[in-house]
């Protein structure tokens, strides 16, 4: 298979895995991370992130540009029963899809990755089928989500932080894949991306606890071609985020919620660390 055609194929798969990651994350947050359903869904989402990572690494190795705009995820939102049925159907469709792609490629590593995507999708389908079958009558007929407590304008502010932190994270992930020949720096960027995922989750959980679906705005990922430029831009982004979070921590509404303030304190300390690390990495590359 020609390289350009292979990159296009893998990028489509990447978009599909991205869609699954977001769907299971959002559903897990709406259920609540401390509930059995929520914890199970977040576990599936983490596995989908690995699926994204395997594909993104290959795309980067091939010299391609990763597509970080998620595809759509079709599901029936009528009830938990219909939602989980949709999940089973989605994962089952991926099994023959990935197996067919594996048959079409010659590279042994890429073939194995696609085969693994297929059999892990089969496991996901079985797990979702099992969850759906164990729902109580009340759970089966109901929908996830809590009652709204926070003011709408404050929720809107948190939603913007979800979208902003998501862009920061995806930019780091993209850069780690594209610049993977600089192995140590690429790993440090991926390490920071994992931290940004935790920061994103803090905001998203607060939104979801109010019965609101966390939203992710696609796009905004820069196709930077020089690693030094990527590091400088990353430090600028984290500095801007830190300033917003300092202001958010002092907001009167934030001060009413000790858990939110604690998470912001952690995020601010992490952002100080990230900024210092990025500064040193940029100096080393200059």
Spell out what each predicted region is.
Residues 1-286:
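Iron-associated oxidoreductase/ferritin-like identity signal
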């Amino acid at each position: 298979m020609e390289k350009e055609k292979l990159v296009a194929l893998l990028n489509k798969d990447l978009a599909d895995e991205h869609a699954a990651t977001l769907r299971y994350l959002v559903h897990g947050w709406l259920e609540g991370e401390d509930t059995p359903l929520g914890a199970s869904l977040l576990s599936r989402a983490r596995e989908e992130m690995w699926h994204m990572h395997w594909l993104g690494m290959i795309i980067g190795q091939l010299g391609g540009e990763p597509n970080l705009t998620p595809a759509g995820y079709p599901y029936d939102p009528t009830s938990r029963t219909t939602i989980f049925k949709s999940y089973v159907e989605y994962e089952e469709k991926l099994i023959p899809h990935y197996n067919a792609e594996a048959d079409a490629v010659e590279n042994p590593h890429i073939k194995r990755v696609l085969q693994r995507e297929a059999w892990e999708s089969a496991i996901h389908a079985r797990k979702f089928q099992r969850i759906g079958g164990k729902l109580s009558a009340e759970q089966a007929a109901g929908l996830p989500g809590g009652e709204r407590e926070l003011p709408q304008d404050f929720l809107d502010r948190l939603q913007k932080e979800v979208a902003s932190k998501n862009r920061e994270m995806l930019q780091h992930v993209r850069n780690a894949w594209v610049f993977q020949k600089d192995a140590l720096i690429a790993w440090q960027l991926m390490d920071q991306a994992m931290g940004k995922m935790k920061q994103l989750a803090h905001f998203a959980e607060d939104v979801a606890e109010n019965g609101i679906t966390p939203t992710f705005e696609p796009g905004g990922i820069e196709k930077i071609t020089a690693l030094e430029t990527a590091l400088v831009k990353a430090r600028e982004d984290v500095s801007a985020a830190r300033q917003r979070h300092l202001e958010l921590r002092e907001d009167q509404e934030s001060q009413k919620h000790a858990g939110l303030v604690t998470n912001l304190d952690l995020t601010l300390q992490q952002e100080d660390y990230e900024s210092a690390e990025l500064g040193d990495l940029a100096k080393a590359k200059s």
